[in-house]
């Protein structure tokens, strides 16, 4: 545990204040579950292949981020099994599809793919002669 900020006391629910966890192993629950909140887990890796293996060794795949020289980061991003991979930033473009891989969900929201998810198609056949 590296950093935690003092915030108002929360008395019910499952919440954690903004925090950075170090010395995290990929087998730990905190590394394997989807955590929605201001939480960062630091997992060390030997090389890029090891980093990609760690990133892909989860049941989920909603968001990922890669930081480094642009072309190298893009090459790594292509190898990560995630619905969204941010490269050297974490913007959100509402015109882009948003959704996960694996147990992070099927389907997309946003962009053309998101509209298709919420569109019900119908085929009409008219063989009557007037």
Q: Which residue ranges define each predicted feature?
A:
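Short, solvent-exposed loop/turn elements at beta->coil junctions and helix N-caps
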Residues: 4-10
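A short linear hydrophobic-aromatic micro-motif
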Residues: 1-4, 86
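Conserved C-terminal structural/oligomerization subdomain of aldehyde/semialdehyde dehydrogenase
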Residues: 8, 15-130
């Amino acid at each position: 545990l590296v950093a935690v900020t003092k915030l108002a006391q929360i008395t019910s629910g499952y919440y954690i204040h903004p925090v950075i966890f170090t010395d995290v192993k990929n087998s730990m629950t905190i590394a394997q579950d989807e955590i929605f909140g201001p939480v960062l887990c630091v997992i060390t890796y030997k090389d890029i292949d090891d980093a990609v293996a760690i990133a892909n060794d989860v049941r989920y795949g909603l968001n990922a981020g890669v930081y480094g020289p642009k072309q190298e980061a893009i090459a790594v991003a292509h190898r990560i099994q995630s619905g969204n991979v941010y490269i050297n930033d974490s913007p959100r473009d509402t015109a882009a599809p948003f959704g996960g891989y694996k147990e992070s969900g099927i389907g997309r929201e946003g962009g053309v793919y998101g509209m298709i998810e919420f569109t019900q198609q119908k085929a009409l056949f008219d063989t009557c002669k007037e």
